[in-house]
Amino acid sequence: MKQLLLSFLLIFFLSDVAVAKDSFSSLSEAQVKSLVCRKWKLTFLEYKGKKKDIPAKVPASYLVFLADGKLQEFEGSKKYDGTWTYHHETKTITTIDQDGTEKHKIISLNSDQFVMNGNYKGFSFNMGFKKAD
């Protein structure tokens, strides 16, 4: 009975992951851009499989992707402007801002959550955002 339950849970988990992956990969370029264009609040960072929530005492960080290709970054009371482009074939967003030019692979995206990868001084990590608008 335990093996049956374990098998069922494994199949359920794998099918759930496949559906989630397919739902993002089946979106058109216009649909992805429409989902990206909003205000996002940074809620977690993930490095080497370890997820760390952003503490409430840390000043909030936001990204605002505008439909005209402009990008606004807010870190506490500081604001930085930049630009962004989306590349549908590779599911990447390229940003140009005070940190230079960076390419971010979209890991997951829906109307409430957005996860993309980032790099800092040679370290690759994932950034998780929640819809803020």
Language model region names:
Residues 4-13:
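Sec-dependent N-terminal signal peptides
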Residues 16-81, 88-133:
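Lipid interaction determinants
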